[in-house]
Regions:
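Glycine-rich, proline-tolerant flexible connector loops at the mouths of alpha/beta enzymes
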Residues: 23-32, 50-72
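Active-site loop-to-helix "anion-binding N-cap" substructures in soluble metabolic enzymes
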Residues: 78-81, 100, 120, 124-127, ...
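N-terminal amphipathic alpha-helix/helix-capping segment at the start of soluble metabolic enzymes
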Residues: 1-19, 77
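Catalytic alpha/beta core domains of metabolic enzymes, predominantly
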Residues: 129-228
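Alpha-helix-loop-beta-strand connector modules within alpha/beta enzyme cores
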Residues: 37-46, 65-91, 126-132, 182-194, ...
Length: 228
């Protein structure tokens, strides 16, 4: 099993737990810093490794009028401030190959969104940064199919990989968590992450925006921790 080194801690299925938490999309700087401060205090009290997560652009939106984020430059500025003030690694996602280099200069982990993880040019561009690359398993792929995604990254010269379970499509506007993915994907030899919040998303479930069933998040998170 691959063990990844990040700042002053390690990431691996047999290593102490790492929490990736922050905001879904970077909003105002005040919101970002308030949330980061809360995470910093809580994870410090619980002695949990923490990586701040925030997206500078949410390109995959239901409506043209939906808020997407502050954009690349402003988003990276916010992430750099969080990283500096709270001494924590940061993760964000990219949507285009051209974003990989700029993001790699600030972020410790680059995330490839679920709908984009089969985009070969994007995967290769991210891999070439040599950063840790987190692949969110698409709602339309089975756990065994993630082997193909991994191989693209490895062929580009990067084996710093994590795989993130985030639910599977179950009819219209509904995701379900197939927790069999948690013992299946480690067989590829890389650390596994569970996104308990996006796993309860209801894509497009509110017409012009997505809904969700947040009341189930704690149960999925506990189940994932129990699996290890």
């Amino acid at each position: 099993m691959k063990i990844l080194k990040l700042e002053d801690f390690t990431i691996g299925n047999e290593e102490p737990m790492t929490l990736m938490g922050g905001v879904n999309v970077l909003e105002s700087e005040s919101v970002v810093m308030t949330v980061a401060e809360k995470f910093a205090k809580t994870t410090s009290n619980l002695n949990i490794n923490w990586i701040f997560k925030g997206s500078f652009d949410k390109a995959n939106r239901s409506s043209i009028s939906s808020f997407r984020g502050p954009g690349l430059d402003e988003g990276l500025r916010m992430l750099e401030k969080v990283k500096s003030e709270f001494n924590t690694p940061v993760i964000t996602d990219i949507h285009e190959p051209s974003q990989a280099d700029s993001v790699s200069k600030v972020c410790d982990v680059i995330q490839i969104p679920a709908f984009l993880c089969r985009q070969t040019d994007l995967v290769i561009a991210a891999a070439k940064t040599k950063k840790i690359i987190q692949f969110k398993k698409p709602q339309f792929l089975s756990a065994p199919e993630m082997k193909n995604v991994i191989e693209k990254c490895r062929q580009a010269g990067n084996e710093n990989i994590t795989l993130c379970e985030r639910g599977n499509s179950f009819g219209y506007n509904t995701l379900v968590s197939d927790l069999r993915a948690l013992p299946i994907m480690p067989k590829f030899g890389f650390p596994i992450v569970c996104d308990a919040t996006h796993s309860v998303q209801q894509p497009g479930g509110m017409g012009e925006k997505s809904g969700g069933q947040r009341e189930f998040v704690p149960y999925l998170a506990r189940a994932a921790i129990a699996v290890g």
